[in-house]
Amino acid sequence: QELRALPSRHEFDCDYRSGHLWTSVLPRRVGLLTEWQHEASHKWGHDGLRFIPREQLSEWVASERYQAGLFDPEGGHLNPLKLALGLAAAIEGAGGRIHEQSKALGYREEGGRYVVTTEHGRIRADVLVLACNAYLDRLDPKLSSCVLPVGTYQVATAPLSEEQATALLPSNVC
C-alpha cells in the first residue's frame, strides 16, 4: 500500500499498475495455484486471489501455452528506474542528501544519530536506509542472516506500440 501511495504523495510517476498473475504452463501444476489460493486465504487472510481457468486466460494473456492462472489484485508492477529517480528527487526535495558511489564499510549509532564510515570519510545522518539488496554480509552480518535473496527476472524487447502491448497483455498485469 505504501508503494502505491508514494508516487502520488511525492508527485512522480513510476508506471505503477495493479495486479499480478501467476500462471501454470504444465497441467500437473494447476493444482498448485488453487493450493496457493487456499493457503493465502486461510493462513494470511488474503481472500482477494482469483483463480482463472484456461478458458478465460485469453482475456488476460495472448498465449495458448498457459493452463490456468491465479490473479492477485494486491500485487503489481512498476518501472524501477522511475521509482528510484522519483524517490531520489523526493528525498532531495525534502532536504535529504544521497551519497552515491560511497561504499559503506560500517555504521554505528552515536548520540541518537547514525555515523556511516565510507572509503573516503564519514557521513552523519538522522535516518539511515540500508538499501543493499541482499548483500549486507560485511556491513551488518546479523541483519544479513535474516535476509533471503530474491530472484528477479526481466525480459526486454524492442519498444512495443500501445496497440502491440495491449494485444499481448489485454489485462496489463505482470
Label each region the model flagged:
Residues 81, 94-97, 108, 131:
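Extended non-membrane alpha-helical scaffolds
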Residues 51-63, 97-114:
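A conserved short coil-to-beta-strand element within the FAD-binding core of flavoproteins
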